[in-house]
Amino acid sequence: VLDIYEQKLGQTRVLDIYEQK
């Protein structure tokens, strides 16, 4: 569960940075 949660957070962060840029 932690793995999936971390993966989801990482993906969201990447998308956030991509959108910001």
From Swiss-Prot:
Annotated organism of origin: Populus euphratica
Keyword tags: Transferase
Enzyme class label: transferase
The protein's name in its UniProt record: Glutathione S-transferase 1
Function: Conjugation of reduced glutathione to a wide number of exogenous and endogenous hydrophobic electrophiles. In plants, may have a detoxification role against certain herbicides.
GO molecular function, one term: glutathione transferase activity
Reaction(s) catalysed by this chain's protein: RX + glutathione = an S-substituted glutathione + a halide anion + H(+)
EC identifiers of the protein: 2.5.1.18
Family: Belongs to the GST superfamily. Phi family.
Coiled-coil parts of chain: none
